[in-house]
Regions:
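Ser/Thr/Pro/Gly-rich, low-complexity intrinsically disordered stalk/linker tracts of secreted
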Residues: 24-261
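Bacterial N-terminal signal peptides
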Residues: 9-18
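Generic low-polarity alpha-helical segments
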Residues: 1, 18-24
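Bacterial N-terminal signal peptides that target proteins for export
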Residues: 1-10
C-alpha cells in the first residue's frame, strides 16, 4: 500500500515539475535573426582606389516558440569592405532635428537613404500578446558630428493605409555612430527606452528594410562618395549583432555580399 502511495505521489510531482518546466520555457523569449543585403557597385575597389557603392539591407527578428520577440536594445551593423566619408557631406544637427520632429529642417545633401521598421507591440506581462502594431518610416541622415549618423523614425496613429500606422506617435532620431572595424565599418547604436517601451508596452522590432544611396560629390578636387568600397573579397558580409533585452544575450546574423559593376 505504501508503495502505491509513494508511486502515485511521485507521479504527481513529476507531472507538476514537467508542467512547470513547460510554463517556464513558454515564458522565455528566444529571439531568432535573419539578415539579407546587397552592395551595388565597388567592383575592383582597393584601399588606394575606393569606389562608390549603394547598400541595401534587411533584417528579420522572430521568436523560437512563437512568442512576441524580446525588444533589442543594441545593434552593431558591420559592412564588410566599406568605409564612410561623413565629413565630406552636409550634416544635420541632431538637436535641431529632434526639436522640429521632421527631416525637412536638414540641409540639402544630408539625407542618405530611407526605409521602414515594423514592430509587434504588447503587454510586458503577456509574451503571447501581439495585439498592437507599429509601422515606422526610416530616414537616414548624415550628422554634423563626425562619423555620426541619424536614424530618424516617424510613426503616425492614423493613415489611409492601416498597415502604415503606429500605436503611438513617433518623431525622433536615434544618434548612431560609424566605427572603423577590422575588415570594414560598423554602424552602432542603442535604442532609447521610450522607443523600446512606449506607453509602458514592449515594442519588438520584427523587420527593418533600409536603402543607403550612392551619394557622391567633389571634395578637394576629387570625387568622393559617402559609402565607398575598399575591397571586394569573396568572404565579405553584412553582419548584424543584436543584443536582446530580456537576458542581455548577443547573437550575430550575416549575409554574404559581392561587389558589382
Amino acid at each position: 500500500m505504501r508503495s502505491k502511495i509513494w508511486l502515485a505521489t511521485a507521479a504527481v510531482v513529476t507531472v507538476a515539475v514537467a508542467t512547470s518546466a513547460v510554463a517556464i520555457a513558454a515564458d522565455t523569449q528566444v529571439n531568432t535573426y535573419k539578415v539579407e543585403g546587397s552592395i551595388k557597385g565597388g567592383k575592383g575597389a582597393t584601399a588606394k582606389a575606393p569606389k562608390p557603392v549603394a547598400v541595401e539591407f534587411n533584417y528579420y527578428v522572430g521568436e523560437k516558440n512563437g512568442l512576441r520577440p524580446s525588444p533589442v536594445t543594441d545593434y552593431s551593423i558591420l559592412f564588410g569592405g566599406l568605409k564612410v566619408n561623413t565629413s565630406d557631406f552636409p550634416g544635420c544637427d541632431v538637436d535641431k532635428l529632434t526639436a522640429a520632429g521632421d527631416p525637412s529642417v536638414c540641409p540639402k545633401g544630408s539625407i542618405m537613404g530611407s526605409g521602414r521598421v515594423i514592430n509587434e507591440v504588447g503587454q510586458p506581462s503577456n509574451l503571447n500578446d501581439k495585439s498592437l502594431y507599429c509601422y515606422l518610416e526610416l530616414t537616414t541622415i548624415n550628422s554634423t558630428k563626425k562619423n555620426h549618423f541619424l536614424l530618424f523614425l516617424k510613426g503616425v496613429q492614423s493613415a489611409p493605409d492601416p498597415k502604415k500606422t503606429c500605436v503611438t506617435q513617433v518623431a525622433e532620431p536615434i544618434d548612431a555612430k560609424f566605427v572603423k572595424r577590422n575588415g570594414g565599418t560598423s554602424l552602432d547604436f542603442t535604442v532609447p527606452q521610450n522607443l523600446l517601451h512606449p506607453a509602458s508596452l514592449d515594442n519588438a522590432v520584427t523587420n527593418v528594410q533600409s536603402k543607403l544611396k550612392n551619394q557622391s560629390k567633389k571634395s578637394k578636387g576629387k570625387k568622393v562618395s559617402f559609402f565607398e568600397s575598399t575591397s571586394c573579397k569573396s568572404t565579405q558580409k553584412i553582419s548584424v549583432t543584436f543584443t536582446q533585452e530580456s537576458d542581455g544575450s548577443k547573437q550575430t546574423a550575416s549575409t554574404p555580399t559581392k561587389c558589382t559593376k
